[in-house]
Regions:
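Conserved helicase RecA-like core
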Residues: 2-380
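Intrinsically disordered, Lys/Arg-rich low-complexity segments
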Residues: 382-419
């Protein structure tokens, strides 16, 4: 399918083609017609699938028709709520790109900065508002935001908002909007708590699910270390010191695990910081800035918190914990090797994660280099003789990601994983 087959206005098509796009991605091809038809929508898609354009393009098309002449009064007709400043900025840039040849204006607001420029822009009048929950509610309470004329509400990265404790804020925001609004709900994963949230806000929604990319970048060198679980921190320190690694993004399966890795590295005089849902917006931004400015050599992140990280030149990614969803591995190591640069993706695999590694291998179909020459190998057994399949580590109940096996456990356990 071509973009020109989606019945979009000429001004939007021109902006899209200027970006070099002729064919919509699967999420765009499925979502854009449904949004244009006025349907509520649940979209399950990870970052990197073209999700933002899947809602930005049809919203711009609809509002361009509604607003028409630039003489018409500016009112907030589309609201995008997203959990972090980084994501809000990226979404705002997308709206600017695709609305380039329309008279629509967008404003991106978030906390941690002065509200005065944001208030000035709101007073001037805007068509599209992209906001983090806290700043949105704050400015609404002060009387600077009027949502009475809202046409479309987008809740983006819903699972991350849940992870960061924004559920009550989101509920408050939805109550401020007209009941006859169109609601678009996007999440990378769909655990029970997210599905319940969607049922509260949407009316007869259409559902679009897009599988993540399964292939890994050719310019990323992949290595796997089979290591005793209790020795992972020692191996991480060993690699950082002996191979002189810097600008390293380390993935941990849990927030608590991320904090513990940082503590262990700091004890060995390694400048490290963690980023996850329990940290405030300002704290996350400070950590990101320090990492980008090379004041911190190692950034430890959970999968959800890492979505807003956009760093072109990232030489090393380390999977301290293997993900329990194979596609997440592809997304993680795709953080390196960007913009024509090479990259190295290193993974640690303990015995109880071997099933995860087998599942990852089935997906990527790449012969990953096994590094046996290191101080912390398995005490007994070998990867070749270890059982395969989706063996779950004992603590897998605490891990993120939507997995079909969750349906066999009660909903209380499911919810605990996501709060």
């Amino acid at each position: 399918m071509l973009f020109e087959e989606l019945s979009l206005s000429k001004s939007i098509q021109k902006a899209v083609y200027e970006q070099g796009y002729t064919n919509p991605t699967p999420i765009q091809e499925k979502s854009i017609p449904l949004v244009l038809a006025g349907n509520d929508l649940i979209g399950c898609a990870q970052t990197g699938t073209g999700k933002t354009a899947a809602f930005a393009i049809p919203i711009i098309h609809q509002l361009h028709r509604i607003v028409g002449s630039s003489k018409k009064a500016k009112q907030i007709r589309a609201l995008v709520v997203t959990p972090t400043r980084e994501l809000a900025v990226q979404i705002g840039q997308s709206f600017d790109t695709y609305a380039k040849y329309t008279n629509l204006t967008q404003l991106t607001i978030f906390g941690g900065v002065s509200q005065n420029p944001q208030v000035d822009a709101l007073k001037t009048g805007i068509d599209i508002l992209i906001a983090t929950p806290g700043r949105l509610l704050d400015l609404h309470k002060q009387g600077f935001i009027d949502l009475d004329h809202l046409h479309t509400l987008v809740l983006d990265e819903a699972d991350q908002m849940l992870d960061m404790g924004f559920v009550n804020d989101v509920k408050k925001i939805v109550k401020l909007t007209p009941k006859n609004r169109q609601t678009l709900f996007f999440s990378a994963t769909m655990p029970i708590a997210i599905r319940e949230l969607a049922e509260m806000f949407l009316t007869n929604p259409e559902t679009v699910t897009v599988s993540p990319v399964s292939s890994t970048a050719e310019n990323v060198e992949q290595r796997i270390y089979f290591v005793e679980k209790t020795e992972k921190r020692n191996l991480l320190y060993h690699l950082i010191k002996n191979e002189n690694l810097s600008d390293v993004l380390v993935f941990s399966r849990t927030k608590h695990g991320a904090d513990n890795v940082v503590k262990a590295l700091r004890k060995n005089n390694i400048a490290a910081e963690a980023i996850h849902g329990d940290k405030s917006q300002n704290a996350r931004q400070r950590v990101l800035d320090a990492f980008k400015n090379k004041e911190v050599g190692v950034l430890v992140a959970t999968d959800i918190a890492a979505r807003g990280i956009d760093i072109d030149q990232l030489p090393f990614v380390i999977n301290f914990d293997l993900p329990n969803i194979p596609e997440t591995y592809v997304h993680r190591i795709g953080r390196t090797g960007r913009a024509g640069n090479g990259g190295v993706a290193i993974s640690f695999c303990s015995k109880d994660e071997h099933g995860y590694w087998k599942d990852i291998q089935k997906l990527i179909k790449v012969d990953v280099q096994k590094v046996n020459d290191h101080p912390y190998p398995w005490h007994s057994g070998s990867p070749e003789t270890a059982p395969g399949g989706s063996t779950k580590p004992k603590n897998s109940n605490r891990s993120g990601g939507a997995h079909k096996s969750r349906k066999s456990t009660n909903s209380k356990q499911n919810k605990k994983r996501w709060y």
